[in-house]
Amino acid sequence: MNFYLLFKSLHLIAVISWMAGLLYLPRIFVYHVENLEKEEAIEIFKIMERRLYFFIMRPAMITTWLFGVILIYINGLDIFSQLWMHIKLFLVIFLTIYHEYLGICLKSLKLKTNTKSSKFFRIINEVPTVILILIIFIVIFKPI
């Protein structure tokens, strides 16, 4: 069995799951903020947000990192001599920080201390898309 391809497949599955959450959670925040007067809807959004963040996004982020580190180990540390890998890691670290920021937003919505507008959440919803596009092009083309 080719373990490299196995771990690469698992890494990609984890990345896709993580990205789905990073793209969807801010959209739920938009609906949450736009329906603050509807208590029943807010309770549903809180459940959706919590489950998405803790049961899909967090495990997907952890397994993305885990399988990514395993792939680096299999490839050998000399992969760090390539600039594209440094850029990719920087972008993945940025996505991780963004993920944690969404966790802060989740908590502020839960505690009713949120000061962000639905427009804000619509705008930050584009961040992971741009980063994903950059990562894909960097990994496929390895331009530098």
Where are these regions (language model features)?
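Polytopic transmembrane helical bundles with strong interfacial aromatic enrichment
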Residues: 1-144
